[in-house]
């Protein structure tokens, strides 16, 4: 007969009643670590080849088609095991595998975002000043402006000519490519700059990208440096300056993903937020076999700027996709949505001892603690968040524990310190358990 609580030692009581934080490394075998490291090699390849939302969708479509997915046809009636994808304007994508029970008991959704903080070009970006050519930018998402100066930048995106011709651009990623940069003041002249608060030392209007310093070979030419850049772009891409008006050009760090540390235990790269979730969400559905309920992975755009716009999850494209799945089976879409569940897959902050003042240690997530769960995000008094119901949190706990998943729970830093949002609220607003 089990001993009553009063008869147990303090150690036994502690093991039975308390929830101490443990280092998950010692719960994982060397074999599993080796598998995780192998998985991360694929992740690093994804980070290097898909630095923008358009490139991420191209990657997802190619991978999906290799795994038997086909473009979704809302007029077609699908059977269990069928695999489909919906490409939303080349900037967001929904993938689904039909379950044995179809949609009648709801669908199971994993949602992540594939846009990143970056520097977008202004509509009229090209100019010259003091014998140098530059591009004017408008930053996208939450950035620390000082981090974008004096680093190598690569140019990604599309230029759409007035006749509708789409020209893809990617410069700065391949060996031998030129790269670009935003200049900073050299330390010898930086005394005044150093006295400014970090948030005001660089402004958005300062983030102009240096792209050249040679003129066309004509001493009488007007705008000779700007003209030389357009000459080069015209020779390579057949575009003129006016075509930049209808372009989506993004400048991103040109760094490649690398291992961090002597033990290679971490990955350093641009775009972890949210590719560290988007890649596993994609891999999960690509390798899903015979689901009971229909499963859906959503890789969405515009999260970094509030999820508005027709490729963000505050629009209707995901709801329309699930509605089409439901109606094809004779189900009422709103009933399917209300029975559905979603994991909003986004990043949280691991405790950093060098910046301990912004964390509340007891409610932080830690390196080697496992997958991070956040019941809510938002800011201050939980503003702008979906606060997951306790019943759903319990279901997630049970699911992970039953599958042997190493996990932890925490908040995104101290209350009133800052905060962050994600797509969870837009899923929950459609009555999806999130």
Regions found by a protein language model. Name each.
Residues 1-434:
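N-terminal hydrophobic/helix-forming segments and targeting peptides
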